[in-house]
Amino acid sequence: MGNTDYWNEAIGHISSRDPILSRIVEAYPEPKLSPHGDVVRTLIKSVVGQQISVQAADATWERMVALMGGVDPGRIYETDIMSLRGCGLSMRKAEYISGIAEMWERGALNVNWDELEESEVRERLLPIRGVGPWTVDMVLIFSLGFQDVLPLGDVGLLRAVENNYSGGKKLTLEEVRGIADPWRPYRTVATWYLWRTIDAEPVNY
């Protein structure tokens, strides 16, 4: 399981280099990120949440829980595609999470993830159907606790940066990268606090 032993040091680092983030950290002192180590769970939950609102994703997830008595790859593996679709998933998403569950069933995801570098995690996960850079970023943050992830594919993060740094004006990804550069090597922590500014209740993938 990932850990966040770096968290307090990270807060000091980003706060000393960015007065805007310093104020945000003070406004949202708790909770901090708590990586859970379950890569497969994050893959599945992230696929469910792709390109829909947090509220819609939560509703779909709750229907999946009700259908299967809990959401895990074993239960998904035993559930047919049309039943998954009945939870509110598109056909494509239902196929994606079924494929992930099948990989889990045959042991293809039985990996010592904590021993891998960030680049190695990306190399292993990106070839999976339905898994893109954003989904891998969620795994790196919420499952494995990597400290310097900047999920530029996350609409919420981009909106939070624009709200706090440009008065809501649209920014290019290059501009966001520039704003985020002083946060290195703790961009995960900065991302976590910026997310709080648009949703005080933490999302957990």
Kindly label every feature range from the protein language model.
Residues 20, 24, 52-53, 57-129, ...:
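Alpha-helical ds-nucleic-acid-binding substructure associated with the helix-hairpin-helix region
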Residues 10, 17, 39-44, 60:
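Short N-terminal amphipathic alpha-helix/helix-capping patch enriched in small hydrophobics
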Residues 1-31, 95, 118, 133-205:
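C-terminal accessory module of base-excision DNA glycosylases/AP lyases that mediates lesion recognition
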Residues 44, 97-100, 161:
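Buried hydrophobic packing segments
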Residues 43-45, 84, 180:
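Amphipathic alpha-helical segments that form the core helices of the histone-fold
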Residues 8, 38-42, 78-79, 121-122, ...:
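Alpha-helical scaffolds flanking conserved acidic
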Residues 36, 40, 44, 53-57, ...:
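Hydrophobic (often cysteine-bearing) scaffold residues that line and stabilize catalytic clefts
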